[in-house]
Amino acid sequence: MSKIILTGDRPTGRLHVGHYVGSLAERVKLQNSGLYDEIYIMIADAQALTDNAEHPEKVRQNILQVALDYLACGLDPEKSNIFIQSMVPELTELTFYYMNLVTVARVQRNPTVKSEIKQRNFEASIPVGFFCYPISQAADITAFRATHVPVGEDQLPMLEQCKEIVHKFNTVYGETLTEPEIVLSSNKACLRLPGIGGKAKMSKSLGNCIYLSDEEDVVKKKIMSMFTDPNHLRVQDPGRVEGNPVFIYLDAFSRPEHFEEFLPEYQNLDELKAHYQRGGLGDVKVKKFLNNVMQAELGPIRERRKMWEQRTADVFDILKAGTEVAREKAAATLHDVRSSMRINYFEDQDFLNQ
């Protein structure tokens, strides 16, 4: 069986470092591993419209921004098909058929759906499209026969629901769909990066992000304003590293070579943490180190993004070519689905002989 990846993002804004450590860096690593036969990276504009129906221009404008972030991070159009979800109408038809296999109660139990409904204040009035987006996600995954789906930890319930839909379809109509496996980041600190305020997951809508495209001075300003241990009032006070966003970010981004270059008095992050915990290490020094680490990571991404910003016509061609490949793949899956459901009437010679 071919090894196929499907993953993507909603174009509701520029991508941030939470996206990067949560899945983007892993996608680039998987892309360059040579272990996968096909890779599909979806800009999920149709899904973004489920809670932005009155602001389509916001979604439209951010498609290019997300594509630029993808290319800046190292996604290679020679190896990965980057495409626009709404330009593959087969996905909508698959969603419609899968809706018949899922109950309202099951979608309501999905922890990710419950969390996002609350976050968007949709409790009193939930758009049907938004409520059904786990089913749409299952259509996206199965349309490309994805065997592996790199996502953040918060998307685990969505993958479980997708697997249920695959199992139900194959049970009712015969073996047709491919069951996917989830791919989580190998760095556990990357699974859920908090916002700079420390109280919530990094989110564009909450305004607590460090964007991949932020200029160097903006990144520094955000890092120096980050939440730390509120009880670490003086340098000599012992500090907590658990739940401390600065150390969570260091867990996600720092490597041994960063200490050699930027903070040679410490061998590694464990030594830095131990000093902070026993007291005598100030937050400013730790934040300055984090800034150096993140500038080293984000600097090359910024430069590549600026290069692609001068080549937007090429980005357009990349999206168009990737979408054509994606549509061909999805159409083949839809053909198989319709055959299994026996609704391929004009291709079935037995239709008149029942």
Model-derived features: positions:
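N-terminal Rossmann-like or analogous alpha/beta NTP/dinucleotide-binding catalytic cores
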Residues: 2-139, 257, 296-298, 306
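A generic structural motif
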Residues: 11, 149-150, 208
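Internal, conserved structured core segments that host functional sites
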Residues: 111-115, 119-169, 173, 194-195
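Extreme N-terminus of proteins, especially the signal/transit-peptide cleavage junction
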Residues: 1-3, 346-347
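Conserved nucleotide- and phosphate/pyrophosphate-binding catalytic cores
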Residues: 157, 163-354
